[in-house]
């Protein structure tokens, strides 16, 4: 049984919990996966201490015992979606490894202006890391890592918007 009550940001929700100690959270737009800097004021998924070295939050259970809650992967602040956390270090390491080896399939959805023309079945571009105002940002460029992503138009309305899936 899960006796750890996660101190969630008010805009985030637990979608599911597995008894092995894995949480699936719905992370809202504008909420950080973890604090970028010590003493930062930006809202994070959990309002508890984050250990940068161990990549985990420190949360208390109902009896006052501190537990480490490991962040499995990250989502950018501007991205909403499912975020995984684990209370078991070995399991968190296995899951992180699966993400780093790209064994986990992810789909990103984007609402776009749609002009009715056919959509290319892929997006291909070079991505470059740049420092802008002291923050690392990724943007399209002439050099860098090649990004190749499948694209499909999932839904088109009779308005100017459509829903794209980036696989």
Name these PLM-found stretches.
Residues 1-167:
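RNA pseudouridine synthases
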């Amino acid at each position: 049984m899960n006796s750890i009550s996660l101190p969630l940001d008010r805009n985030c929700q637990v979608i599911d919990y597995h008894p092995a100690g894995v949480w699936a959270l719905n992370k809202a737009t504008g909420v950080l996966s973890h604090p970028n800097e010590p003493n930062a004021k930006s809202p994070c998924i959990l309002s508890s201490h984050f250990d940068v070295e161990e990549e985990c939050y420190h949360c208390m259970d109902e009896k006052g015992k501190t537990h480490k809650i490991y962040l499995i992967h990250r989502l950018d602040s501007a991205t909403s979606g499912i975020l995984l956390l684990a209370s078991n270090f070995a399991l968190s390491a296995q899951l992180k490894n699966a993400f780093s080896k790209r064994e986990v399939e992810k789909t990103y959805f984007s609402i776009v202006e749609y002009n009715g023309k056919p959509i290319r079945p892929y997006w291909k571009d070079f991505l470059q890391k740049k420092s802008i105002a002291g923050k690392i940002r990724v943007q399209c460029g002439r050099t860098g890592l090649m990004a190749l992503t499948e694209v499909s138009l999932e839904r088109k309305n009779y308005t100017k918007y459509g829903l794209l899936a980036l696989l």
